[in-house]
Structure formats: C-alpha cells, structure tokens
Amino acid sequence: MRWRTILLQYCFLLITCLLTALEAVPIDIDKTKVQNIHPVESAKIEPPDTGLYYDEYLKQVIDVLETDKHFREKLQKADIEEIKSGRLSKELDLVSHHVRTKLDELKRQEVGRLRMLIKAKLDSLQDIGMDHQALLKQFDHLNHLNPDKFESTDLDMLIKAATSDLEHYDKTRHEEFKKYEMMKEHERREYLKTLNEEKRKEEESKFEEMKKKHENHPKVNHPGSKDQLKEVWEETDGLDPNDFDPKTFFKLHDVNSDGFLDEQELEALFTKELEKVYDPKNEEDDMVEMEEERLRMREHVMNEVDTNKDRLVTLEEFLKATEKKEFLEPDSWETLDQQQFFTEEELKEYENIIALQENELKKKADELQKQKEELQRQHDQLEAQKLEYHQVIQQMEQKKLQQGIPPSGPAGELKFEPHI
C-alpha cells in the first residue's frame, strides 16, 4: 500500500487505510505503564477534502486504479519521483478492460461537469462570443482532445496537476487568511465611522480589552520540541512523562501504521498547544486564527524534520530531529497574537481594491436598475397603447351601431342577427 500512501500523502489526500495483506507494525511499549489504552476498531477512514476543484474525480480515479492487481503491484514498488514524473502512467495500458471502462466513464462525467461549469460561467458573464474550447483548456487535470477515453496521458496530467496545485495550497491559505484579517479590520473601522464619539471610545476600549484577554494565555511550547511532545505523551496518551520515548511516541501517533507521520497526523499533535490559546466559547478567540496557527506549526515542524521534502516524516527523520539541540533547547514560539498580519499600506491597498469592486458592483446595480426602469416604461407604454386601441375599437363599434351597421367580429367579419 506504500504507493497509495506516497501518492495521496503527497497530494494531501492522505488515504489512511492499508491493504489487508499488510500488517501494522507492532508498538513496543511497556503495557504496565500505559493507562487507558483502548483497542481501535477497524473502520474505513474517509480521506480528507484536498480543496481542489477536481477533488472528487481524483479520489474516484485512485479508488478504481486500486482495484487492478497489476497496477497496484507496480505502484507498491514506486517512489515519489517515479509517480511525480509520470513514468508509471504508462502502466495504465496494462490494466484490465473492466477498469479502463470505469475510468472512461469517470472521465466523461468529469468533462460533463466541467462543461456545466463553463456554461454557468458564460451565462453569468453573458459573453456569447467566448470560446468554449479555450475555457475548457483552463482545466489542466485531464486531456480534452479525447473526452471519452481515459488514457495514460490523463493519469499523468492528473498527478502533475494535483502535485503542482497542492504544493501552492498552503501559500494560498496564508494569503486568504491575510485577506480575512484585513477585511475584519476594514469592517471594524467602517463600523466605528458610523458611531458618535462616545460610542466609538466604548468600542475601542472593548476591542483593546478583548485583545488583552486573548493574549493572556499559558506559555505555548515550541512545536516539535521535547517539551511539546512530552506534554502530548502525558496528557493525550496518558503515559508517564519520565518514560518518554521518541520511537514509541512516533508509533503511537502513526495512526494508520504506514510508517510515516503525515500532515494530518502532525497537526493532531498541536491540539493541546492550540487549546491554551483558543477556546470556541470565548468571544475574543477566533477559530479561523486557530487554524492558521495550526498550519504554521505544521509547516515549521515539516521544515525542520522532513529532510527529503516529501511531506511525510519517517521514523528515521523523526529520531534524527530528536537528537538536535533545538529539540531540547528550542527558541520561544511566537503565537499569532504576537505578530502583525499586515501593514497600514497593505490595508490601504486592500481597501482601495474593495472600493473599486464596490464601485463596479454599484455600476452594475445602477445599470440593472436602469434596464428595469426602461422595461417598466416600455411595458407601461404598451399597456397605454393597448388601452387606447381598445377605446378606439369601442368608439367605432358604437358609431356603427348608431348608423345601423351590424358590429364586426374579431376578424372584421360582419355579425348579423338571425331572423326568427
């Protein structure tokens, strides 16, 4: 199952089930010193959402490929570079007809989904002159030239697209967090402008008080340090801190027993530290900031420990990290409340962008209002013309009656009264 771990861990899917043929590595610990250790029931663990717009397609393709014995055996021996380079994609030519048929169907469904997205985009832009094929080429995780067949090119493109997109995923999350904080500050300042001086001072005072309350928390251990891991060992694992053993710790927290600590398994180690700073019940604690803090901690530990940069921590890498001086005597960890997310210049630039966007929206709203008013004017004009027409018809009918001429029917034919 190592191929699946490598591929999906690298792509952040982190599928945590093993092939039934593989057995978990036994954990060598003194059972007399372990408290409250309960056997974990076997269960299918759903892979987390990668955040990619083709996440479901990626998962389905991997699930189908896993059912082919030949392909699975080839990939069990693969390393990350072989998977990333696309050399293994050629093995797709040897999978069973049944598997290829399923992959073909998945691709047709994905192409159909993308075309629906494009249609929705075109409808929203009302740009009939836009080239559909050019839009389709924006999606680089499949081969558009053959929309009905899943080929080795498709697998190669899917792996490379996921690898590239997810390598930039953390950076994108940091940028989105920064925008979130700037928007928060922008909205706070805009709200203050609506208040009188007395109310404004009250709000400013409350804001400063909330900041102080949030900053008043226990010391946060440096992520990945001995103190931090020992705290997890004692409080989460229920073990004696004097018996702390890095090798045992690694095996305890390698939840799926695949020989690696993946990003989700690492992030789980920081929960106790984050709970010192963030409480969802407290008004002053922002849970969005907590997730940013978790991401920063994980990135820091990965940079320090993951020497081959494959986004996975092996037991060897983990043990080497525990031999470093920084493991025993780390620098103090600066939490987000000790940092400035943006400068005044950056906030000003962001507010200018918001103002431009608001102006564009206002222009569109004004245009729509004008169109609505014009349509209403035309409607009223048509109604007036209809009324005038009916009045003229009625006057003509009355005049004919006065002259003794039979009234005409809807088609202009004369109506005669039957003689009895």
Curated annotation (Swiss-Prot):
<keyword id="KW-0539">Nucleus</keyword>
<feature type="modified residue" description="Phosphoserine">
    <location>
        <position position="332"/>
    </location>
</feature>
<feature type="binding site">
    <location>
        <position position="317"/>
    </location>
    <ligand>
        <name>Ca(2+) 2</name>
    </ligand>
</feature>
<keyword id="KW-0165">Cleavage on pair of basic residues</keyword>
<feature type="short sequence motif" description="GBA">
    <location>
        <begin position="304"/>
        <end position="334"/>
    </location>
</feature>
<keyword id="KW-0677">Repeat</keyword>
<feature type="binding site">
    <location>
        <position position="254"/>
    </location>
    <ligand>
        <name>Ca(2+) 1</name>
    </ligand>
</feature>
<dbReference type="GO" id="GO:0005829">
    <property type="term" value="C:cytosol"/>
</dbReference>
<feature type="binding site">
    <location>
        <position position="308"/>
    </location>
    <ligand>
        <name>Ca(2+) 2</name>
    </ligand>
</feature>
<dbReference type="InterPro" id="IPR040250">
    <property type="entry name" value="Nucleobindin"/>
</dbReference>
<feature type="region of interest" description="Binds to necdin">
    <location>
        <begin position="213"/>
        <end position="420"/>
    </location>
</feature>
<keyword id="KW-0963">Cytoplasm</keyword>
<comment type="subunit">
    <text>Interacts (via GBA motif) with guanine nucleotide-binding protein G(i) alpha subunit GNAI3. Preferentially interacts with inactive rather than active GNAI3. Interaction with GNAI3 is inhibited when NUCB2 binds calcium, probably due to a conformational change which renders the GBA motif inaccessible. Binds to the postmitotic growth suppressor NDN; coexpression abolishes NUCB2 secretion. Interacts with MC4R.</text>
</comment>
<dbReference type="InterPro" id="IPR002048">
    <property type="entry name" value="EF_hand_dom"/>
</dbReference>
<dbReference type="GO" id="GO:0001965">
    <property type="term" value="F:G-protein alpha-subunit binding"/>
</dbReference>
<feature type="modified residue" description="Phosphoserine">
    <location>
        <position position="257"/>
    </location>
</feature>
<feature type="region of interest" description="Disordered">
    <location>
        <begin position="398"/>
        <end position="420"/>
    </location>
</feature>
<dbReference type="GO" id="GO:0005886">
    <property type="term" value="C:plasma membrane"/>
</dbReference>
<feature type="binding site">
    <location>
        <position position="256"/>
    </location>
    <ligand>
        <name>Ca(2+) 1</name>
    </ligand>
</feature>
<dbReference type="GO" id="GO:0070062">
    <property type="term" value="C:extracellular exosome"/>
</dbReference>
<keyword id="KW-0472">Membrane</keyword>
<keyword id="KW-0106">Calcium</keyword>
<dbReference type="GO" id="GO:0007264">
    <property type="term" value="P:small GTPase-mediated signal transduction"/>
</dbReference>
<feature type="binding site">
    <location>
        <position position="306"/>
    </location>
    <ligand>
        <name>Ca(2+) 2</name>
    </ligand>
</feature>
<dbReference type="GO" id="GO:0005783">
    <property type="term" value="C:endoplasmic reticulum"/>
</dbReference>
<dbReference type="GO" id="GO:0005085">
    <property type="term" value="F:guanyl-nucleotide exchange factor activity"/>
</dbReference>
<dbReference type="GO" id="GO:0005615">
    <property type="term" value="C:extracellular space"/>
</dbReference>
<keyword id="KW-0333">Golgi apparatus</keyword>
<dbReference type="Pfam" id="PF25434">
    <property type="entry name" value="NUCB1_N"/>
</dbReference>
<dbReference type="GO" id="GO:0005794">
    <property type="term" value="C:Golgi apparatus"/>
</dbReference>
<dbReference type="GO" id="GO:0005793">
    <property type="term" value="C:endoplasmic reticulum-Golgi intermediate compartment"/>
</dbReference>
<comment type="similarity">
    <text>Belongs to the nucleobindin family.</text>
</comment>
<keyword id="KW-0344">Guanine-nucleotide releasing factor</keyword>
<keyword id="KW-0479">Metal-binding</keyword>
<protein>
    <recommendedName>
        <fullName>Nucleobindin-2</fullName>
    </recommendedName>
</protein>
<feature type="binding site">
    <location>
        <position position="258"/>
    </location>
    <ligand>
        <name>Ca(2+) 1</name>
    </ligand>
</feature>
<keyword id="KW-0256">Endoplasmic reticulum</keyword>
<feature type="binding site">
    <location>
        <position position="265"/>
    </location>
    <ligand>
        <name>Ca(2+) 1</name>
    </ligand>
</feature>
<feature type="DNA-binding region">
    <location>
        <begin position="171"/>
        <end position="223"/>
    </location>
</feature>
<feature type="region of interest" description="Disordered">
    <location>
        <begin position="195"/>
        <end position="225"/>
    </location>
</feature>
<feature type="binding site">
    <location>
        <position position="310"/>
    </location>
    <ligand>
        <name>Ca(2+) 2</name>
    </ligand>
</feature>
<feature type="domain" description="EF-hand 2">
    <location>
        <begin position="293"/>
        <end position="328"/>
    </location>
</feature>
